[in-house]
């Protein structure tokens, strides 16, 4: 056992990290990454041990303030450190790494220990990798989904019909929800939209909406907003919905993987937790997104529908074109601006954005009884064109704590680089992966003002010197790095009509 004095530090290492000077560890049985219990007169909390030469002095233990829930300490107070038992779920993670099927109890134990932060980031990464490599059967996914929902807030509603739209993501600029949700809410349909922050894309719905208003609402605030407006657009982590999901996402994000079992459970756990009865799942298909072809998309759709049936949620899936970005704007601020422009003047907005938004909203208008089968898309367009969707969107912004803005009032990164066409020709390809990587290199999604604006899309004719796209960043260094990356990965591909001249055989 070690006796040390608590020192509060502002550092987030993911798990409940505790930091000890390496001099205090010499000659002991304590090693970095050991699991330890921090004990004081007020209680105890589990932590993962890290060592340092300079961050804390000999005789101190560094405790990240934001992570030490469950214990009340004063700085300088003496605490005890002792070895903690290894989590039970470690053996079950190894079992999944070996490709075996997990029992319901084993899955519940893993999720419980993720939520209680008994697992280190390394152990979490092992679990995520095991499901990425070996997958899960439907029984495992159902159990994981239920437990992910049960370990967080479970929201109930006065209305019996509550709906949701969700995209599995992967498409840069996928901002459809900022149009679809206010369309549905304006029609009187209850749609409490909760979403994750970006995992593999440069901006999630929550990242984009955060440019315009507060997205971190608790359960009571969320219910108040929905009661006032019929809808909301908030971050699921702020409401404590399926808390294991955001912990897992933080492990997935650095390596840009989203294992299908986690994808299914992540999406549907939040539907269970928010009391959803009808859900439309958008599955983008195309080069550079998660689902490469229609056959693969149909297979995933069947899994979503089956999982929904087992959870008593009616699910319809839509395969959408994902071969290039949705609209022209990629990155939180740029996407928020484009969404506002589309709500303000839908006739001038990118057709791909409008078509996707009203198509998805139209399905739920039909399922919810607001429109006859086949008339949903028409009604969605009428609500959008009339200005009712913009009015509802601004109402949601206000209720969530923001102030409505005009598109031109949204600030973009002050460091800008225009990339021009080297030849006369046509846009023959836009690489989603390259676009995503360039925008991330520019600083998105953490830098809300970072992004990329496409001046041309596939099939457009361009002349030499025309602007192909513009990169924005809040950092000159990040902008230069993004531009250098763009020169290597060619986000936009231009080709002339003449491929090669051949005069001899």
From Swiss-Prot:
Any matching Pfam family: PYNP_C
Active site (catalytic residues): 258
Reactions mediated catalytically: AMP + phosphate = alpha-D-ribose 1,5-bisphosphate + adenine; CMP + phosphate = cytosine + alpha-D-ribose 1,5-bisphosphate; UMP + phosphate = alpha-D-ribose 1,5-bisphosphate + uracil
Keyword RNA-binding included in the entry's annotation: no
Superkingdom classification of source: Archaea
Any single Gene Ontology cellular-component annotation: cytosol
InterPro entries linked: AMP_phosphorylase, Glycosyl_Trfase_fam3, Glycosyl_Trfase_fam3_N_dom, Glycosyl_Trfase_fam3_N_dom_sf, Nuc_phospho_transferase, PYNP-like_C_sf, PYNP_C, Pyrmidine_PPase_CS
Binding site for AMP: 170, 196-201, 205, 266, 290
Presence of the UniProt keyword Membrane in the record: no
GO molecular-function term, one example from the UniProt record: AMP binding
One Gene Ontology biological process: AMP catabolic process
Family, similarity comment: Belongs to the thymidine/pyrimidine-nucleoside phosphorylase family. Type 2 subfamily.
Biological role: Catalyzes the conversion of AMP and phosphate to adenine and ribose 1,5-bisphosphate (R15P). Exhibits phosphorylase activity toward CMP and UMP in addition to AMP. Functions in an archaeal AMP degradation pathway, together with R15P isomerase and RubisCO.
Name used for this protein in its record: AMP phosphorylase
Origin species: Methanococcus vannielii (strain ATCC 35089 / DSM 1224 / JCM 13029 / OCM 148 / SB)
């Amino acid at each position: 056992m070690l006796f040390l004095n608590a020192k509060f530090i502002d550092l987030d290492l993911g798990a409940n990290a505790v930091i000890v000077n390496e001099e205090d560890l010499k000659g002991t049985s304590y090693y970095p990454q050991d699991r330890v219990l921090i004990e004081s007169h007020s209680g105890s909390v589990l932590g993962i041990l890290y060592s340092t030469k300079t961050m804390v002095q000999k005789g101190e233990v560094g405790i990240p303030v934001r992570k030490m829930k469950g214990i009340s300490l004063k700085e300088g107070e003496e605490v005890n450190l002792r070895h903690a038992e290894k989590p039970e779920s470690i053996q079950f993670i190894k079992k999944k790494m070996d490709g075996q099927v997990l029992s319901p109890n084993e899955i519940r134990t893993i999720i419980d220990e993720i939520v209680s932060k008994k697992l280190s980031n390394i152990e979490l990464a092992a679990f995520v990798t095991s499901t990425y490599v070996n997958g899960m059967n439907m029984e495992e996914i159902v159990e994981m989904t239920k437990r992910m929902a049960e370990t967080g807030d479970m929201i109930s509603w006065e209305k019996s019909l509550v709906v949701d739209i969700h995209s599995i993501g992967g498409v840069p600029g996928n901002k459809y929800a900022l149009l679809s949700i206010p369309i549905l809410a304006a029609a009187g349909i209850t749609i409490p939209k909760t979403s994750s922050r970006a995992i593999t894309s440069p901006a999630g719905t929550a990242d984009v909406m955060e440019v315009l208003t507060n997205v971190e609402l608790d359960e009571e605030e969320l219910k108040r907003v929905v009661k006032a407006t019929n809808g909301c657009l908030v971050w699921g982590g702020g409401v404590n919905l399926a808390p294991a999901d955001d912990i897992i996402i933080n492990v997935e994000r650095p390596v840009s993987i989203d294992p299908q079992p986690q994808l299914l459970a992540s999406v549907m756990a939040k539907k269970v937790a928010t009391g959803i009865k009808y859900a439309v799942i958008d599955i983008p298909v195309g080069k550079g997104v998660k689902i490469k072809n229609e056959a693969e998309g149909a297979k995933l759709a069947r899994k979503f529908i089956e999982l929904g049936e087992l959870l008593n949620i009616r699910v319809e899936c839509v395969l959408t074109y994902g071969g290039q970005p949705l609209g022209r704007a990629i990155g939180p601020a740029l996407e928020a601006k484009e969404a506002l422009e589309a709500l303000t003047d839908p006739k001038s907005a990118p057709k791909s954005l409008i078509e996707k938004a009203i198509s998805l909203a139209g399905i739920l208008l039909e399922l919810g009884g607001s429109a006859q089968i086949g008339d949903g898309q028409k009604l969605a367009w009428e609500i959008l064109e009339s200005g009712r969707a913009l009015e509802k969107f601004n109402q949601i912004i206000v209720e969530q704590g923001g102030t409505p803005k005009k598109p031109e009032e949204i600030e973009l990164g002050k460091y800008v680089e225009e990339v021009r066409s080297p030849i006369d020709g046509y846009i023959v390809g836009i690489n989603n992966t390259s676009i995503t990587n360039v925008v991330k290199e520019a600083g998105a999604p953490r830098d809300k003002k970072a992004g990329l604006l496409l001046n041309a899309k596939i099939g457009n004719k361009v002349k030499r010197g025309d602007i192909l796209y513009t990169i924005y960043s809040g950092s000159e260094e990040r902008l230069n790095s993004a531009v250098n990356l763009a020169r290597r990965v060619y986000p936009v591909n231009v080709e002339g009509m003449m491929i090669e001249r051949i005069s001899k055989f």
